[in-house]
A protein has these predicted regions:
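Extracytoplasmic/secreted envelope proteins and their assembly/folding machinery
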Residues: 55, 59, 82-85, 108-112, ...
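Hydrophobic membrane-insertion alpha-helices, especially the h-region
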Residues: 9-24
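Flexible loop/hinge segments that line or gate small-molecule binding clefts
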Residues: 103-128
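Periplasmic-binding protein-like
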Residues: 40, 93-102, 121-125
């Protein structure tokens, strides 16, 4: 019985060491850049192939530069999209890419103005 406990303990210690080694190597091999650009993207719907392709192309560039892309789908709900913009502000993104569900929504306009006032660049796509 004691032999089984010793083996289990050794296996546990071995797994813990491998985990720590993996974490260490990750941080040594993957360059950390505290100046990574954070981008928030919200399109009126991700059910449209156009927005999927657009987002995939943006994501490729973001990954190449080791930056961060947060993509959200409001599913044609302007209130949800407004909440997403407010979340991007809280996350302190550098850029918001938006295809507005309702470009005339006062709540959405207010949230986007707040983003702009905090220094976030706002890029509107596929809208008049």
């Amino acid at each position: 019985m004691k032999k089984g406990k010793h083996i289990a303990l050794l296996v546990s210690v071995f797994i813990a060491l491998l985990t720590m080694l993996g974490i260490y190597l990750h941080y040594k091999l993957v360059p950390y850049n505290e100046n990574r650009v954070k981008i928030g993207a919200t399109y009126m719907t991700m059910n449209n192939d156009f927005y999927k392709v657009l987002n995939n192309e943006i994501d490729k560039i973001v990954e190449e530069k080791n930056d961060i892309l947060y993509t959200r789908d409001p599913a044609l709900d302007v209130n949800k999209q407004t909440q997403q913009v407010e979340l991007f502000i809280k996350k302190r993104v550098d850029i918001i890419i938006i295809n507005p569900v309702d470009a005339d929504s006062k709540k959405l306009i207010k949230a986007l103005k707040k983003a702009k006032e905090t220094g976030i660049k706002v890029v509107v796509v596929d809208s008049q």
